[in-house]
Amino acid sequence: MTENLNPREQYLGNPNLKKAFTSSEFTEDQIVELSKCIEDPKYFITNFINIVTIDRGLVPFEMYEFQERMVDTFHNNRFTICKLPRQSGKSTIIIAYLLHYVLFNENVNVAILANKSSTARDLLGRLQLAYEHMPKWMQQGVMNWNKGSLELENGSKIVAAATSSSAIRGGSFNVIFLDEFAYIPNNIADEFFSSVYPTI
């Protein structure tokens, strides 16, 4: 990251986040890159997403073949169930795809839900970290940014919460990511689907 935002362009003094409605001028190369990213989430993830690994710290995201297939599946299907072992990188690729989704679609709502609120917030935190390390010219300006939610200037929002029947009551969501759903007790899972299914 070589770009620097001046203090007036920063969201609440964070030098890694662009404030909403900050004017931007794009080079021809940047316009080409944006077009490629809009068309292909795998291109975006490979070229503009950084993740934290235990061994190497912050590094560019190098997808495995199964993660590329997951992205294709998400992008081409309304409903997807993934059954994968722990520590396989499933949550990381889903978070990367959700970042692409909110960045390049206007006025969409996304919920990240997990068996515990702390898990959901950790997932959102990983998405936020990836966002902060994107080039500023690619970022949407930030309207709201905290441990439980974010809102971008394009009107797209993400919320993180524990899975329960009341977790996202009253909202309509374009995408709901349910992590660790196997650990949700059956009675809560049933109530959750009864209240949430009509919203998607």
List the predicted regions and their residue ranges.
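Phosphate/NTP-binding elements of NTP-utilizing enzymes
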Residues: 2-200
